Amino acid sequence: MIVNIASPLYGSVQGFRRLDFSLYATVAILISVGIVMVASSSLDFAAERYHDTWFFVRKQITFLAMGLVGGLVILAVPMSVWNKYSGLLLILAFFLLMAVLIPGIGKVVNGSRRWLSLGPFSMQASEIAKFCLIVYFASYLARRNEELRTQWSGFLKLTAVLLIIVLLLLLEPDFGSSVVISATLGCMMFVAGVPLARFLLLAVSGVAGLALMAVASPYRWERLVAFMDPWATQFDSGYQLVQSLIAFGRGGWFGVGLGNSLQKLFFLPEAHTDFIFAIFTEEFGFIGAIALIGVFGFFLYRLVILFRRASEQEQFFSSYVVFGIGVMLAMQAFINMGVASGFLPTKGLTLPFISYGGSSLLITCGLMALVFRVNLELNRENQEGKP
């Protein structure tokens, strides 16, 4: 497939003036907060580990620049092209999730084989798969909507794809991504009109299966026990959660101030990645945490508005893409914040836009480019429809 990018790219850049400014500004705010918090939470750790205070900040800014360039390319591609070639994206997702399991290709980090080595960089296969799967699921729901609503075959085909994806993720293992992807597809199927009985069957089966796997795995069971009573194992499996809760406690109402966190000083592991929300709350307090949640809430609200606009204009593929992206990012944010605050067991998911992580930031930029592309196309249709 060869796509002439130059002309659409110019048109897309010119079309930025037609973007939903409030959505664009909200994304910019979240990314800016992320850069600031990566700096605040990682400076001391980077100086100790790499003898380079700005090691993580520089890498995060590099990933952001790459994400913006990649996002412009994605923005230039019409949604009809993504819809047409969605099957290739599904094949790519399968290929990457299988390749990462091969020794020598997949890189083991913290006991999980989730990373693909790409020269000086490493990419998390599940993050790329999320992008591919949202596009494929949206295309399937738009193309096979009648079959999905009225026949078991349409439902079972998509469920089979999901089961294979989840199996590959659990072999890494990546329990958190399997939960997010399963929940995202379930919600997309529900909004596409899958009968309630089938939706409930999928939901109950999924919850039961994931719960069984959590209980059957000694490692996950240990995490679950630590979550229920972290103070009983505060020097063992509950250590990370206890340190996170201490960060919340130190933050109080208004926080200790930007850069003044103590928990980031080698007390709280993964302070700049999975538990960056705890450091944010310590430095900005309960009020700051509520404000950040409010920004995420407004961001999701704008996605819901865009989803409704696409549905009203019968751009169902675009509407399902926007809805899937919204659900996926909302799930990740909810789980990350829930883990950091002790509301959920540890999952190892990043906080979208905020946490350090090249794979997460690159894919999030790509997903936002799809959202902006949908908005551009809807606005163009509105303008062309005017007398």
Curated annotation (Swiss-Prot):
Q: One Pfam family of this protein, by short name?
A: FTSW_RODA_SPOVE
> Known InterPro entries for this protein?
FtsW, FtsW/RodA
Q: Which UniProt keywords apply?
A: Cell cycle, Cell division, Cell inner membrane, Cell membrane, Cell shape, Cell wall biogenesis/degradation, Glycosyltransferase, Membrane, Peptidoglycan synthesis, Transferase, Transmembrane, Transmembrane helix
Kindly indicate whether the keyword Acetylation belongs to this entry. no
GO CC annotation terms, alphabetical: cell division site; plasma membrane
| GO terms, molecular function | lipid-linked peptidoglycan transporter activity; peptidoglycan glycosyltransferase activity
Catalytic activity, EC = 2.4.99.28
The membrane spanning regions, by residue number, are 19-39, 61-81, 86-106, 118-138, 161-181, 199-219, 286-306, 320-340, 352-372
Q: Where in the cell is it found?
A: Cell inner membrane
Tell me the GO BP annotations in alphabetical order: cell wall organization; FtsZ-dependent cytokinesis; peptidoglycan biosynthetic process; regulation of cell shape
Enzyme class, first EC level, given as a word: transferase
Q: How does it sit in the membrane?
A: Multi-pass membrane protein
Family of this protein: Belongs to the SEDS family. FtsW subfamily.
Job of this protein: Peptidoglycan polymerase that is essential for cell division.
UniProt-recorded name of the protein: Probable peptidoglycan glycosyltransferase FtsW
